[in-house]
């Protein structure tokens, strides 16, 4: 069996009202004098004062760059500025876009990357993979974060929709792992049982606790820890296999056909409903869990048109033809896609 490299975060801190400790956290990871921060404008307004005070106390100079979009030009512009600043660390603060951009820039410049999520909408906060706009409408491999720093109090203040989206990304591990097993059985590809079990555990945790979440509200810290665990599973696997299967290809296909429809985790959750039925899994259980946590289970809820959904299912596998999924075993037509969506009440 060929070897693969595991890149894991060195330190993960999850706390409440601990953003003031960011300076000492960074120094514990790597003694540094200059860092570059990447965030959106709203996030900067919320956390700038406390973060800069902590960095000053730790004698760290920072350069702050705003990521208004995640297209190639924005990434290249920020990357050029980070290189010129001679920063020793690249920090991504915010949701998926800023964390992904910082992760990719750190990889391109061979600089350590640190993840500081301010929302929990997907599992990329601790994984080595990024989703950016470009020629390939799917995740690219970059590098795992050197550290992950989470202030749960900040994430609690983010819109509830973002946390529910994170739940959709978690439940996607059910179909992703099954697709990985298919790849092992049909093509002989490497299958990491431990990383697969770790990813599955995050999804099973959500299903097991969905009723509690529906009655008492989503437990932010638990969801965050599950997302981090899923990200670490992909680090151990050396690929996104345990976390990303046909349901993610469906999400990427929707992005390609109609950008801006739904959040990543929302599309993955809906994709999981569809793909789980194709796989012969308990799709009704998945629907119930998603409803319990307030995540969408229908195309209408995220503004996804039936014709776009159908087309997305027919082209999803073509986005990554080398990755074996259940879609390789189905002659998916738009008519079959509509029938599948109606049978699962996605349409």
Place the predicted regions along the sequence by residue:
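Active-site segments that bind and position negatively charged phosphate/pyrophosphate groups
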Residues: 193-293, 297-300
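C-terminal charged capping/lid subdomain of soluble metabolic enzymes
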Residues: 170, 280-347
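A glycine/threonine-rich phosphate-anchoring loop and its flanking beta-alpha core
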Residues: 10, 108-202
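A short, small-residue-rich loop immediately preceding and capping a beta-strand
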Residues: 82-105, 109-120
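ATP/NTP phosphate-donor binding region
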Residues: 1-89
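Short glycine/serine/threonine-rich phosphate/pyrophosphate-binding segments
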Residues: 45-47, 97-104, 122-125, 243
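Solvent-exposed alpha-helices and their adjacent loops that cap or buttress functional pockets
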Residues: 4-6, 29-30, 82-85, 106, ...
